[in-house]
Amino acid sequence: MAANNLAKIQFYEGTNEPVVPEIRLTRGNDGTTGQAIFIFEKPQALSSITEGEITGMRMIDSEGEIMTREVKVKFVDGEPMYLEGTYIWKTKSDFDRFMRFANSYAKSNGLGYSEKK
């Protein structure tokens, strides 16, 4: 797979976030709605070398881009420590598209999947 085809996450357009997040999925009882919560610990996007305002989280793969504006910064002892991005889907097709991105992102970053029981 060519490097430009790798799935990636960006908080600033054109700048890939190298920190791999913990991702938690929840789904509604009907299976069509749900959310994915991305938790980045000490992301580069919060480092002193980055400038500008974070206006969202872009999930980019060979199919295109998924965007969410639901991004929060969590502070520990007055220092920015975590970025938390939440992607909400409301249809099965949105979920299917997200899962294609998630699988591509996992392959690009050598990640696996585990189900909480």
UniProtKB/Swiss-Prot annotation:
Keywords per UniProt: Membrane, Photosynthesis, Photosystem II, Thylakoid
Membrane topology: Peripheral membrane protein
Annotated GO biological process: photosynthesis
Keyword Membrane belongs to the record: yes
Gene3D superfamilies in alphabetical order: Photosystem II Psb28 (2.40.30.220)
Compartmental location: Cellular thylakoid membrane
Subunit structure: Part of the photosystem II complex.
HAMAP family: PSII_Psb28
Protein name: Photosystem II reaction center Psb28 protein
Gene from which this protein is expressed: psb28
